[in-house]
C-alpha cells in the first residue's frame, strides 16, 4: 500500500508537534529507523502491516 507524499508530510508534522525523535517515532510506529526514513520521504510501497501502523499513528491523539 502506498505511503504518499501527503502521508509522509503528516508523519513529519506530527513527529515535530509531539517533539519526538526519529528513533522514538520509529518505535511508536513499530518500524526500523530506516523504514521510518522511507515513510517520511513518501512514495513508499509499504506492506499492509506498516501502512496500518502509520495510519494508526496519524489518527491517535
Located regions from the model:
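The alpha-helix within a helix-turn-helix
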Residues: 15, 26, 55
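Intrinsically disordered, low-complexity regions
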Residues: 2, 36, 52-56
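Residues that mark the N-terminal boundary/hinge immediately upstream of a DNA-recognition element
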Residues: 10, 21, 47-50
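Short alpha-helical DNA-recognition segment
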Residues: 19-37
